Amino acid sequence: MLLKADPTFYASPKLAMQAPKETLAYVAALNATGNGKPDAMVVVDVDPASKSFGQIVGHTDMPNAGDELHHFGWNACSSALCPYAAHPHVERRYLVVPGLRSSRIHIIDTKPDPRKPKIVKVIEPEDVAARTGYSRPHTIHCGPDGIYMSALGAPNGDGPGGIFALDHYTFEPLGRWEVERGPQYFGYDFAPGI
């Protein structure tokens, strides 16, 4: 059996730029009305040749109100090809979607039908806090040895914030990623590799 990397993983930025363009976009739809309805993930057709170009073609409600969906991203990317921690068999199919206000993390499967994404897992804030010591997940980045998430602060609403990791396959929180956070107190965004 030959293992083949996900075709959306590219060995260079040049190869990524030469790849076919995306035809769908996933967009967080926040409900800031206070009416008790949840946020949603909507699917927008971005294929200029499509009859439904620019229209919402899919919709998935979150299971709880008040999440405030934030900087979400894919579970896997080209970093899975990294020679020191290769995971060429992971597939870019899950959106990892943090709720900034609720501290929940939603795992949304975009297959088998990318227009009908389904929530397959919700990581509750108590689990994030117990395993990482953080809350308010903010930004996700896929990485060679896990999925990295920045967190704005601690479960008590104060600092310190930092970065924690999720497992590529189970999406379970693995714990804090950084060894030493330095002088920063509240976390925000981050850029792996810098």
Roles of regions detected by a PLM:
Residues 109-194:
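Asp-box/WD-like beta-propeller blade repeats and closely related beta-sheet repeat scaffolds
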Residues 30-32, 98-100, 110, 152-154:
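Short loop/turn segments immediately following the C-termini of beta-strands
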Residues 2-21, 68-91, 133-144, 188-194:
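Structural signature of eukaryotic scaffold interfaces centered on beta-propeller domains
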Residues 40-42, 104-106, 162-164:
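A short loop-to-beta-strand structural motif that recurs across blades of beta-propeller domains
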Residues 34-37, 90, 100-103, 155-160:
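Short, solvent-exposed loop/turn segments at conserved positions within beta-propeller repeat blades
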Residues 53-139:
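Blade-loop segments of beta-propeller domains
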Residues 1-47:
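Sequence/structural signature of beta-propeller modules
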